[in-house]
């Protein structure tokens, strides 16, 4: 009887045959470890999650035959991405155009200052993003935010192009205190200003969004 119980327990336990280590795209500081770990730990079948922020890697135990696409999806929903052994990707890739069109994103040319009260999305956390096409970090942050929005429909983005720091949107951003790009201002679901983020550090962006959702 005892031997049978041991056998049943063994059969019921998942067979963790594989340990997978892979690059996590988007880790830019030690504070990124908790959201990466949380995202990976949420995937069914994943155990023993370890994140190395210096090497920008994650290591997980998964069952034999596990679909690694689930890891990438979980990271994407948290604003990160994954590069598995054999792949050659260095940056977070933009979403397909049809998916981007389904997100609550409105772009403004920056020729006029934004009427903040009018552009905010009622009932949603709204990020007002002052950006420029020549700003590389702005483009990376844009892709991260769009991926994050896929799993967070309560989020909206209003993007204002500051040109070459020479238009109305640029003057407005400067008035708000922007000293560099990317520059975000986060508002809660009631339209109350919560926080600003300069530089696009992802842990700070996530913290601002979380604060707005309280």
Regions found by a protein language model. Name each.
Residues 17-18, 105-125:
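A short beta-strand-turn-helix
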Residues 77-106:
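N-proximal helix/coil linker or "cap" segments that precede and/or mark the start of modular domains
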Residues 37-43, 137-151:
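Typically the conserved alpha-helix immediately C-terminal to a functionally engaged Cys/Sec
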Residues 25-28, 123-126, 130-134, 180:
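Short pre-active-site segment immediately N-terminal to redox-active cysteine/selenocysteine motifs
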Residues 51-57, 130, 153-168:
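Thiol-based oxidoreductase modules, predominantly thioredoxin-like and allied folds used
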Residues 4-15:
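Sec-dependent N-terminal signal peptides
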Residues 73-76, 180, 186-214:
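Non-catalytic, surface beta->alpha helical segment in thiol-disulfide oxidoreductase systems
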Residues 23-70, 77:
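N-terminal targeting signals for Sec/Tat export/insertion, comprising classic cleavable signal peptides
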């Amino acid at each position: 009887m005892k031997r049978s119980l041991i056998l049943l327990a063994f059969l019921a336990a998942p067979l963790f045959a594989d340990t997978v280590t892979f690059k996590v795209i988007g880790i830019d500081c030690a504070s990124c470890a908790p959201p990466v770990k949380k995202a990976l730990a949420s995937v069914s079948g994943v155990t023993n999650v370890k994140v190395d922020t210096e090497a920008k890697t994650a290591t997980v135990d998964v069952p034999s035959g596990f679909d690694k696409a689930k890891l990438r999806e979980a990271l994407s929903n948290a604003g990160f991405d994954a590069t598995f052994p054999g792949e050659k990707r260095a940056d977070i890739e933009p979403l397909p155009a049809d998916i981007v069109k389904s997100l609550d994103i409105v772009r403004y040319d920056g020729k006029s200052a934004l009427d903040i009260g009018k552009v905010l999305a009622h009932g949603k956390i709204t990020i007002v993003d002052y950006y420029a096409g020549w700003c590389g970090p702005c483009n990376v942050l844009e892709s991260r935010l769009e991926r994050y929005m896929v799993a967070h429909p309560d989020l909206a983005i209003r993007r204002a192009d500051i040109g070459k720091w020479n238009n109305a949107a640029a003057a407005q951003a400067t008035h708000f205190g922007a000293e560099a790009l990317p520059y975000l201002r986060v508002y809660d679901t009631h339209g109350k200003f919560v926080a600003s983020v300069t530089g696009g550090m992802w842990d700070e962006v996530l913290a601002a969004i979380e604060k707005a959702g309280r």
